[in-house]
C-alpha cells in the first residue's frame, strides 16, 4: 500500500489550550552529541547493531562530481572568433556597441526628481505598502490564537513517520500545518492530555502516541522542533530477550504494538492503553509505571475509552469479537462481557446518555448498548466493510458519524434509538482509517485515510444535515465532577450515572 499521504490517527485540541507563542528548541553541541549517543545505545540494546554495507562512493562517481564542479576553462587561442564574441549585426540590433558610452547630460536631472522621495526603514512603516511580506505571514501563522483549534494527526510517509500539528480556525477560514514532529515508529493512535508529571502539579498541552512498538511516547505540543518526547511509558524488548523467549511482565508494560489510548479526564494521572499483546494497561503517569494490567480478552485489544463522567468505568473492544466493561477499582473481579458478529473496531460512550455506548465491527455493523443490559438497543448495518470511525457530535444529541474502509462517511440520526441515514459521501480518500469530532464545533469533523492527507469537513454545509440537526438544541457538557483520590482510582461517594 502506498504510504505517501496516509493519515492513520487524529485528535483535536480545544481552543485556548495551546500556548500563544510556542517554544522553539535550540540544542547545544553537547545535547546533540548526547542524543546521538543515546540513539546508538538504543539500537545496540535492541540488537540492531548489525552493520549494513554502505559502500564508499565509486571513483567514477567522484570523478563525475569533480567534473561538474570544475570551473569552465578559458577558450584556447585557436577557437573561432565568432564563438567568443557577438558579431556586428547583433551589436547593432541591441545597440550594445554604444553601451559603454556616457549618457545624455539631460539624464542627470533624474537625480533631482528623486530628492522628494521618502525612504522608510521597513515596509511596516510605509503607508503605501499594504501587502505583507512572507516573514510577516509566517510570524502570524506561528502564533496560536485563543480561537484556534489544533488538530494532531499521525502520518506515514514513504520513508518516515511523523506527527503533524495543524491549526484550524473556522472564523478565519484558515487551516494549515503549524509544525511537525518526527516519530521513531509507525503511529497507530493519538490521545490529547493535559497531565504534567512535574512536581508543581501544573497542566500542559501533550499528545500521547501509540505505535508499532510497546512504547508510548508523550510529546509537548507547545514545543516546536523537539527531538525527543517529554516522557515515555514502557520499554522495548531487546532482540536477545526475544530470542530467549523471555516474556515481559505487566510491571514493565506492553510486549507488542499499542493500538489505542484513552486518557482519564477525572483522574488526570491515569492513561489506558490497548495492545496487540491482548492486554489493557492502566498507567500511573505520575510514576511512569503500570498501575494495573487487565487480561480479559483473548486476542488483540483494538479500542478502549474511559467513561466521560465516571473515573472508574472503562470499556474495551477486541479482535476476539467482544467488548468488556470494567470497574477499574477491581477490574479482574468486576467486569462484564458482550459478544458480537465481528471483530470490534471502535467503541465510544454516548455522553448524552451515560448508560449507553456504541461499538462498531469489521463486518460493517454498529451496535447501541445499555451497560445494564445484555441485548443491544439497536443493530445497524451501516457499511460494507470495517467501521474505523465512530464519532458522536460533541454537542448535537443523536448525530452520529461513521467512517469505513469502504471509503464512505455516513451521517446518522440515532435520536430515539431509531437510526436513520441522513447523508452518505465517498470522501475520495481511499480506505478511511480514522475520524474525530471537534470538541468546540459540533459539525466539524476531521478524517484521515489512505490518501489525500488530513481532511476537515463541516457537515452542516449539507442541506439534509441542516434539516435534521440545524434546529436541534446544542448541549455543551460542563466540567466533569472530581473528588479526592487516594490511589490511581478512588472510591466516589456520590451516586454515579452508571448505576441504575
Swiss-Prot record:
Keywords: Chromosome, Nucleus, Phosphoprotein, Repeat, Ribosome biogenesis, Transcription, Transcription regulation, WD repeat
Residue numbers spanned by region Disordered: 38-88
Keyword Transmembrane included in the entry's annotation: no
Gene3D superfamilies tied to this protein: YVTN repeat-like/Quinoprotein amine dehydrogenase (2.130.10.10)
UniProt modified residues of type Phosphoserine: 49, 58, 484, 493
Location in or out of the cell: Nucleus; Nucleus, Nucleolus; Chromosome
Record InterPro entries: G-protein_beta_WD-40_rep (IPR020472), PWP1 (IPR044285), WD40/YVTN_repeat-like_dom_sf (IPR015943), WD40_repeat_CS (IPR019775), WD40_repeat_dom_sf (IPR036322), WD40_rpt (IPR001680)
Entries under Pfam families matching the protein: WD40
Phosphothreonine found at: 21, 54, 85
WD-type repeats, residues: 185-229, 253-293, 296-336, 382-422, 427-467
Domain of life: Eukaryota
Signal sequence, start to end: none
Compositional bias ranges of the Acidic residues kind: 76-88
GO-annotated molecular function: histone chaperone activity; histone H4K20me3 reader activity
Any single Gene Ontology cellular-component annotation: chromosome
Post-translational modification: Phosphorylated.
Protein's GO biological process: negative regulation of DNA-templated transcription; positive regulation of stem cell differentiation; positive regulation of transcription of nucleolar large rRNA by RNA polymerase I; rRNA processing
Function: Chromatin-associated factor that regulates transcription. Regulates Pol I-mediated rRNA biogenesis and, probably, Pol III-mediated transcription. Regulates the epigenetic status of rDNA.
Family from the record: Belongs to the WD repeat PWP1 family.
Subunit structure: Associates with the RNA polymerase (Pol I) complex. Interacts with POLR1E.
Annotated protein name in UniProt: Periodic tryptophan protein 1 homolog
Organism: Bos taurus (Bovine)
Amino acid at each position: 500500500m502506498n504510504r505517501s499521504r496516509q493519515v492513520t490517527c487524529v485528535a483535536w485540541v480545544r481552543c485556548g489550550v495551546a500556548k500563544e507563542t510556542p517554544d522553539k528548541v535550540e540544542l547545544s553541541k553537547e545535547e546533540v552529541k548526547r542524543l546521538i549517543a543515546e540513539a546508538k545505545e538504543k539500537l545496540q540494546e535492541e540488537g540492531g547493531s548489525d552493520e549494513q554495507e554502505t559502500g564508499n562512493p565509486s571513483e567514477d562517481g567522484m570523478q563525475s562530481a569533480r567534473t561538474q564542479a570544475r570551473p569552465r576553462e578559458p577558450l584556447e587561442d585557436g577557437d573561432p572568433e565568432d564563438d567568443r564574441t557577438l558579431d556586428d549585426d547583433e551589436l547593432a540590433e541591441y545597440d550594445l556597441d554604444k553601451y559603454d558610452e556616457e549618457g545624455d547630460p539631460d539624464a542627470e536631472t533624474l537625480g533631482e526628481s528623486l530628492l522628494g522621495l521618502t525612504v522608510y526603514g521597513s515596509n511596516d512603516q510605509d503607508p503605501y505598502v499594504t501587502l505583507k511580506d512572507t516573514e510577516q505571514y509566517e510570524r502570524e501563522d506561528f502564533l496560536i490564537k485563543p480561537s484556534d483549534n489544533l488538530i494532531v494527526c499521525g502520518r506515514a510517509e514513504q520513508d518516515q513517520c511523523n506527527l503533524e500539528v495543524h491549526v484550524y480556525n473556522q472564523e478565519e477560514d484558515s487551516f494549515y500545518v503549524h509544525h511537525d514532529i518526527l516519530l521513531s515508529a509507525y503511529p497507530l493512535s493519538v490521545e490529547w492530555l493535559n497531565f504534567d508529571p512535574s512536581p508543581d502539579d501544573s497542566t500542559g498541552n501533550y499528545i500521547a502516541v501509540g505505535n508499532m512498538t510497546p512504547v508510548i511516547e508523550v510529546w509537548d505540543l507547545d514545543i516546536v522542533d523537539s527531538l525527543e518526547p517529554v516522557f515515555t511509558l514502557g520499554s522495548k524488548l531487546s532482540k536477545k530477550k526475544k530470542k530467549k523467549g523471555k516474556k515481559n511482565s505487566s510491571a514493565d508494560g506492553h510486549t507488542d504494538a499499542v493500538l489505542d489510548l484513552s486518557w482519564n479526564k477525572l483522574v488526570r494521572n491515569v492513561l489506558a492503553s490497548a495492545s496487540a499483546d491482548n492486554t489493557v494497561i492502566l498507567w500511573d503517569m505520575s510514576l511512569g509505571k503500570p498501575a494495573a494490567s487487565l487480561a480479559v480478552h483473548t486476542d488483540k485489544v483494538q479500542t478502549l475509552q474511559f467513561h466521560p463522567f465516571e473515573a472508574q468505568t472503562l470499556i474495551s473492544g477486541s479482535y476476539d469479537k467482544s467488548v468488556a466493561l470494567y470497574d477499574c477499582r477491581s477490574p479482574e473481579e468486576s467486569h462484564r462481557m458482550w459478544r458480537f458478529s465481528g471483530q470490534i473496531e471502535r467503541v465510544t460512550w454516548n455522553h448524552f446518555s451515560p448508560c449507553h455506548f456504541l461499538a462498531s465491527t469489521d463486518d460493517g455493523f454498529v451496535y447501541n448498548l445499555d451497560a445494564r443490559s445484555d441485548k443491544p438497543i439497536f443493530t445497524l448495518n451501516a457499511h460494507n466493510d470495517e467501521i474505523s470511525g465512530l464519532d458522536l457530535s460533541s454537542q448535537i444529541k443523536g448525530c452520529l458519524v461513521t467512517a469505513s474502509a469502504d471509503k464512505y462517511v455516513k451521517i446518522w440520526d440515532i435520536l430515539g434509538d431509531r437510526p436513520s441515514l441522513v447523508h452518505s459521501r465517498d470522501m475520495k480518500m481511499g480506505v478511511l482509517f480514522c475520524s474525530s469530532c471537534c470538541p468546540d464545533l459540533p459539525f466539524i469533523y476531521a478524517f484521515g485515510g489512505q490518501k489525500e492527507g488530513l481532511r476537515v469537513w463541516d457537515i452542516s454545509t449539507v442541506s439534509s444535515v441542516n434539516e435534521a440537526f440545524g434546529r436541534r438544541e446544542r448541549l455543551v457538557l460542563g466540567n466533569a465532577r472530581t473528588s479526592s483520590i487516594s490511589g490511581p482510582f478512588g472510591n466516589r461517594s456520590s451516586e454515579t450515572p452508571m448505576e441504575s
